[in-house]
Amino acid sequence: LKGHTVEMMDMFLLSGKRTSHAVAGAYVGIVKHIPFFFGFIYKVGMLISSFRRKSPVYFANALLGKKLASYIDGHDFDIVVTPHLYPAETMTYMKKKKLLHIPAVAVGTDYTCIPFWEETDLDYYVIPHEDLIPEYVKRGVPEEKLLPYGIPVRQDFCRNLSREAARKKLHLPMDVPMFLVMSGSMGFGKLAVFAAELALRCRNGEH
């Protein structure tokens, strides 16, 4: 943000590098290598997730509450923003225990309301689109806290460039169909192989 100072941090580093690597490694490893198990966990999460009670996910992340509170209190922050559920769970615990004294905002980066958002209690929730408001409300997130601003992206993606100018800049043909392959930061895997296979199957001048 122009005129603002932003500090990025991994909350789990407050418990040491081993904890941070273990949490990140377990999550990414399950998604990439045993996705069916991740799907099973997700479905179970949907079944037990409720705004009426707290889940084991909440209590696990609550363990970092005092450390995160100490870190925040030791810096002159005006607001905390998290794009992940786990810190939102931690800060929900902190608010409950009067350990958080500045606003906290969550940014949802999924085009759905994933399990356990409804058991969090932050000041605002930035969500990808206004069409998701009914889903979040149905799950128990107050509508007045929902801000349908979209998923934050680099400003480079917002440049207004015509199709012709973009193709010319990339030295691409002007008059043939083209495919743009995009993926998230984890989970899909072997994107280069997928793109190569897709290229082999292109026909009628497709690229």
Regions found by a protein language model. Give the residues of each.
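Gly/Ser/Thr-rich loops at beta-strand to alpha-helix junctions
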Residues: L1, V81-E89, G184-G189
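Short helix-capping segments at alpha-helix termini
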Residues: K2-H4, K96-H101, V141, L200-E206
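Conserved N-terminal ligand/cofactor-binding loop architecture of enzyme catalytic domains
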Residues: H4-H75
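A nucleotide-sugar donor-handling region in carbohydrate enzymes
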Residues: M11, D123-S185
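Generic structural signal for helix capping and beta-alpha/helix-loop junctions
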Residues: G16-R18, E89, I114, V153-D156, ...
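Active-site and donor-binding regions of nucleotide-sugar-utilizing enzymes
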Residues: K43-G140, K145-P148
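A conditional alpha-helix N-cap/helix-loop micro-motif detector
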Residues: N61-A62, A106-V107, R159, R163, ...
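Conserved catalytic-core segment of nucleotide-activated headgroup transferases in glycan assembly
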Residues: K169, M174-H207
